[in-house]
UniProtKB/Swiss-Prot annotation:
It catalyses: Na(+)(in) + 2 H(+)(out) = Na(+)(out) + 2 H(+)(in). GO terms for biological process: regulation of pH. The chain crosses the membrane at residues 23-43, 62-82, 104-124, 133-153, 162-182, 185-205, 221-241, 302-322, 337-357, 372-392, 410-430. Belongs to the NhaA Na(+)/H(+) (TC 2.A.33) antiporter family. This is Na(+)/H(+) antiporter NhaA. One of its GO terms (molecular function) is sodium:proton antiporter activity. It comes from Helicobacter pylori (strain ATCC 700392 / 26695) (Campylobacter pylori). Keywords: Antiport, Cell inner membrane, Cell membrane, Ion transport, Membrane, Sodium, Sodium transport, Transmembrane, Transmembrane helix, Transport.
């Protein structure tokens, strides 16, 4: 009965999100594998040279642009973070993070799932040049994790899928905070003041409920530039922009107009082909239906396929390729061990222990329909840290510490793969055990 209620509570938006993210996870994995294959083939020199190719335009002696790698990591990933920000705002206002009762359990789980891996890594790499990489195993890749959980189908309770999604959203928010606090260097306050001015203008537009997305996006570009110049990673600008996008919907008059158009269409005669009148009515219905959506919903709907099927796979292809040969030093500090143990051990232990203790102390309550064994399984899948972990590794290790960056990427791939396989097998076995008991 409780499971049925949970399933009914899962909105259509959330179901569509699961489907798109799960497919995106599979596509992401294929691109990561392809990157490793190309980086270790006869094409490896061309592969690595490609990402350092400058792309932009020249004005006299002045070049405006970036390398392809920077375009992907700083510009395209800003759109990915904009999508993340929109998802977080939606969940905070209307979803599983909209009340303390709903949010407390997954948020506490996310905190435990970030602290434990970070501590494991830091303990192993303390007082070394690689200690700054503690943020790498703290992240969860929602696309990969959902890709695995959706392959298990009905063997996994719907309530567990909701929990994992909410945990991953809270984890993304935590990762954004970590990036802003620990991976910011050489702050330039003049540019920060410029960014603050842009944010104030965005806040005024939000207050006025400006429904056109164009002013927000144009100001978002300016905000990105100011934040990029300030020393804070530019993707933070995308998250701030997301929180400034209005979520209010228009008055009920639009609903009435939509109903009248629906009645008009129903009254028209139907044939093998649509008449000109029917086509015009359907076009009007489409326009009115779009107008009923909030700017946040419209932007999220637009960005979802771009993020899932283009930006993240391209990021994976550009960043996952590591040439594994005799020149790579896998023993650089304890990066390999720190990342793998952080993802495979720290994530499940952190999530399980902090939620177990918080429930015993009556701080929060476990969602109905989920056992502690399920929580442990979700913790294992949360150890799939691919996209955000790769992103943080690029911030943590500069070109001067290239060996550590390459080892971290190998560790992320291995740790994520181990977590995904063990998590999937564990949840599969858990379902089989439950079926035998029945």
């Amino acid at each position: 009965m409780n499971l049925k209620k949970t399933e009914n509570a899962l909105s259509l938006t959330l179901k569509n999100f699961i489907k798109s993210e799960s497919f995106g996870g599979i596509f992401l994995f294929l691109n990561a594998v392809l990157a490793m294959v190309v980086a270790n083939s006869f094409l490896k020199e061309s592969y690595f040279a490609l990402w350092h190719t400058p792309f932009g335009f020249q004005i006299g002696d002045f070049f405006i642009g970036f390398s392809l790698h920077n375009w992907i990591d700083d510009v395209l990933m800003a759109l990915f973070f904009l999508m993340i920000g929109l998802e977080i705002k939606r969940e905070l206002l209307f979803g599983e993070l909209s009340s303390f009762k709903k949010a407390s359990f997954p948020v506490i789980a996310a905190i435990g799932g970030m602290i434990a891996p970070g501590l494991i890594y830091f303990f192993l790499n303390a007082n070394t040049p690689s200690q700054h990489g503690f943020g790498i195993p703290m992240a969860t890749d929602i696309a990969f994790a959902l890709g695995v959980i959706m392959l298990l189908g009905k063997r996994v309770p719907t309530a567990l899928k909701v929990f994992l999604i909410t945990l991953a959203v809270a984890d993304d928010l935590g990762a954004i905070v970590v990036i802003a606090l620990f991976y910011t260097t050489n702050l330039k306050f003049a540019w920060l003041l410029g960014a603050l001015g842009v944010v104030l203008v965005l806040a005024v537009l939000n207050r006025l409920n400006m429904r056109s997305l164009i002013p927000y996006l144009l100001l978002g570009v300016l905000l990105w530039f100011c934040v990029h110049q300030s020393g804070i990673h530019a993707t933070i600008a995308a998250v701030i922009l997301a929180f400034m996008i209005p979520v209010k919907i228009p008055k009920d008059s639009k609903n009435v107009e939509l109903l009248e158009l629906g009645k008009r269409y129903a009254e028209t005669s139907s044939g093998a082909l649509l008449s000109k009148e029917q086509q015009e009515i359907l076009h009007s219905i489409e326009e009115k239906a779009s107008a009923l959506q909030s700017p946040l919903e419209r932007l999220e709907h637009f960005l979802a396929p771009i993020s899932g099927y283009f930006i993240m796979p391209l990021f994976a292809f550009a960043n996952a390729g590591v040439s594994v040969d005799s020149s790579i030093n896998l023993e650089v500090d304890k990066v390999l061990l720190g990342v793998i143990l952080g993802l495979c051990l720290g994530k499940p232990l952190g999530i399980f222990l902090i939620t177990f203790i918080s429930e015993k102390l009556k701080i929060t309550a476990r969602p109905k329909g989920i056992s502690w064994w399920h929580i442990l399984g979700a913790g294992l899948l949360a150890g799939i840290g691919f996209t955000m972990s790769m992103f943080i590794s690029n911030l943590a290790f500069t070109s001067e510490h290239k060996d550590a960056m390459e080892v971290a990427k190998i560790a992320i791939l291995l740790g994520s793969l181990i977590s995904g396989i063990i998590g999937a097998l564990y949840l599969f076995a858990l379902d089989k055990r439950a079926a035998l008991k029945k």
